Amino acid sequence: MTTELFTTANTVTAHEHIGFELGWDYAHYRLVPPAPYAQEPSPLRNGLLAGQAAFGSRTLAATRPVRKWLQLRLHAWLRGRSVELMQVTPNYLSQLEVSHCPITRTALSTATLDSSDASVDRVRNDAGYAAGNLAVISTKANHAKAGYGFHDALRFVKQIEAGKLGGIDGLSACQWSRVAVLCSYVEPMSHEEASTIPMLVLPPNRLRMFNPVQALQAFISQQLMAPGWSHRAARFEAMLPGKPARRAFLTFFHALLPRVLEASRANGKQHTRWAIEDAWRNPLVLKRWTAFARLLTATQCEELVARANAKKLGALRAQQLPDEAATEGWNLDSRGYVPHAVLMKRSPTSARTGLGEQIPQPVGTQASLPL
């Protein structure tokens, strides 16, 4: 085996390649990165100039989702965070949009530089920007959540309640409890532990749920979001294994139902969502849910969701993924950062563009990012 050594100055790293592709995409939509990134020498600027030379005026329409997509990628690139581009597309990001922050419940704004501005959060902080790990929350909630997870948020709730504090990092105990529940969805835990968590925030669209009992919990809770829930609940009850499980389900559902109906009457879909979440704060609702959930196994929870979804009993569609596919592109091994890798070696005589920028010549196969 022969080993060849070369300096980093003659190589292109994964981070440089991503920056070049990002600049290329800015040019493809006839946009320019914010100052100073468009002027300072960098792989981003190289890609921008190369793209402008290649596309000229033959560019694509820069829609609002496209602008948010490029902004997210720029923000991630500057911090070395990975973005999985096969699934995280402008269309995907548009499916995550909500009118109100699920943590603070304030109406979200756009580009006002206020704490109410919408921002895309990596729910699991040791993963990158990838499908199933993203949710739109307010800038205020995003900054407070920072790198904290499920157990951190629970600790903050206890500290606030024990010390009678107004809040921590601008969030109240109720808001931190929603952060905890949101984080719990993407943190694998035992069936016993997951069955004791109240659904204080319903899972955002396209979020992947790692605990089967919580997927079942969300499936049942969201029945009340759409008309016809009584018929669907009866059909779901008939699917349960055995009389004890059916009896426990009815006991739980009858505890949840009146609290939701009373709070959400004639107030619209958003208030119905909040009413469902608030109903889970009642100790009786959680107690009866836990009793029901522990009559099932994690496997049975998965099967129930799959069967109910096949029968179209859900208010929303659910898609189940194999374990290995659920975290594809999350870069858990590098804790959500771009893995350090050399993608190609520059040729001593690099080709030049008309703008005086050197284009590296690939060695072997160049890893490429989809546009």
Locate the predicted segments by residue:
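DEDD superfamily 3′-5′ metal-dependent exonuclease/proofreading module
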Residues: 2, 13, 36, 41, ...
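N-terminal alpha-helical interaction blocks
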Residues: 2-70
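Catalytic cores of phosphodiester-bond-cleaving enzymes
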Residues: 24, 28, 47-48, 52-54, ...
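Short, charged surface segments at domain edges that flank catalytic/cofactor-binding sites
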Residues: 54-100
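Generic detector of well-ordered alpha-helical segments enriched in charged/polar residues
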Residues: 71, 75, 90-94, 154-158, ...
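Histidine-centered nuclease catalytic patch
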Residues: 79-93, 99-149
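Polybasic, low-complexity binding patches
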Residues: 123-135, 143-190
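C-terminal, charged low-complexity interaction regions
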Residues: 193-371
